[in-house]
């Protein structure tokens, strides 16, 4: 039977939010078309009928960009969308993170959410429409989702918070924050800010959560009318009898193993206990399912003991205090031929960041749905398998690496000098050499050091720290500088980066259903204390950016010309500019306002290129005398080059004061002669005279200075 199309609407930050259900994608478990202004996103939620034989919840979120949404045809030879853009990957992660905690423990059915962006109004965020639509598609479906959730963007313009700021408002905003959650609590935060105090960030989060509650009420109203009955699923459970056996067998050994301070030794101790228990069951010829359960029960025991130690005894696996940072070390100038490098080590987490400076022509070209076309500041994060002592394939960046790179970029961007102040493209690459948690924050610290070593005049150094949480009912403990095991077995990964003045980036992921204001406030203040300690350490390594760039970095010379002269500098089909580049070996970037950036490692070549361009755009002035070179001789006169690209004609009658029979009697090709500009005609032709120069000289010579007699 044909399902009836239903339409629901609400005002969202001054723009209409319209939801259509029942017409499109009806074979999915849940499907919602969201119209937010002129932004249109089709959201579907689909689940497998049977549970998968895996030890995790198999959720996949795909945020699919279609370039037709902004009236573009994809570039390149193939002319169709390929792998997801960086922005699409970040949007997929943004949707995944608040939704994932809201499925029951033990739910192992595969779930896929697809958000297909079909039309984009730049003032109505497709990411926010997709987040809303993904939650609603799950809520009205028969998939056992414990939502709904919603998310909003919060900006701050002239001291006032704004929900879902427009493009114009975003340009003026000093906060760019996304907050998501349920009606009772916050479960995801993603933010960039211009050194904003923690108190303001907290208020922005709570302001956004009020709007989240309103959107959730709207979803509940829709679900009450069109929602399906939830499917019955069998949740994966551990065998209680087997669990009791293993507790008796291994609990004491695990308690000792998790308190080994050093990561590799601790991992080895835990693995030894696990191997011993599994070997006993293998001797009993236990089947594959039993062995799988044995492994999961052992993991559960490790998790319980780590959490118990932290919440009850305030003891961490490596013996640190709750708010203690691991030992820090850092250095700069590690690599001799790079433009700048910084090595930052925190415990067993180590990152080497390298800064490379390029010309403005080296900017990244963006081919996506946003209004930005280029990017001059980039931060790339790499996580090779050897960093955790493992082998593995060396592929291109995955979702996690792209996400960590973007977080670092967002944290550092507020302190990067403007194009006008520092006309360079800046690329940072963070290589994770050792990992035991908080690598994304270590990459921020190492990148700050690398930029300072490169001589980038950053406004202030930035440091990052990751906070953790272990929560059992009402009893909770916030951890400073979490390591891998605390991240893996804890309830929160709360990353905060900033300067001494305030926060520049923030990212919060949790595994529980939500957090209260009190926990958020405490975590932010504890993070600030830790950040200040790390900044103090970094300042001991390098106090300020180097005054001079590396000798291997390009030197950029800036000049300004009349915009109407740009065509002359470029020349037909780029002939003129390519000639300058070939002759000098420089890179030349020209802005529409006539600003020209000339860059090369050789400063002398920069000056040579500048002189050539100045000659091209230089105007010939009537009445001025120039030293020119004879380039061509005709019967009627000589063509003289005044400067590069500018010729004029000295008619035979203007070559000398006396009558000239043949031009060659007075000048030859290659001669340098003084000429005066007599006229520039309507066609732009320049008429020159040598005779006028000779006459002027004669007149000056003929003038005698007046003699004044002394009075008696």
From Swiss-Prot:
Annotated keywords = Cytoplasm, Magnesium, Metal-binding, Nucleotidyltransferase, RNA-binding, Transferase
**Domain KH: start-end pairs:** 554-613
Protein's UniProt keywords contain RNA-binding: yes
Q: Which cysteines are joined by disulfide bonds?
A: none
Which residues are recorded as binding Mg(2+)?
487, 493
Q: Name one GO cellular component term.
A: cytosol
Gene Ontology annotations of biological process type: mRNA catabolic process; RNA processing
| Cofactor (UniProt) | Mg(2+)
Cellular localization per UniProt = Cytoplasm
What's one GO MF term for it?
3'-5'-RNA exonuclease activity
Known InterPro entries for this protein?
Answer: ExoRNase_PH_dom1 (IPR001247), ExoRNase_PH_dom2 (IPR015847), ExoRNase_PH_dom2_sf (IPR036345), KH_dom (IPR004087), KH_dom_type_1 (IPR004088), KH_dom_type_1_sf (IPR036612), NA-bd_OB-fold (IPR012340), PNPase (IPR012162)
One Pfam family name from the record?
Answer: RNase_PH
Q: Which reaction does it catalyse?
A: RNA(n+1) + phosphate = RNA(n) + a ribonucleoside 5'-diphosphate
EC identifiers of the protein:
2.7.7.8
Residues covered by the S1 motif domain? 623-691
Q: What role does this protein play?
A: Involved in mRNA degradation. Catalyzes the phosphorolysis of single-stranded polyribonucleotides processively in the 3'- to 5'-direction.
NCBIfam families found in the cross-reference section: polynuc_phos, PRK11824.1
The similarity comment for this entry is:
Belongs to the polyribonucleotide nucleotidyltransferase family.
The name this protein goes by in its record: Polyribonucleotide nucleotidyltransferase
Q: Which organism is it from?
A: Geobacillus sp. (strain WCH70)
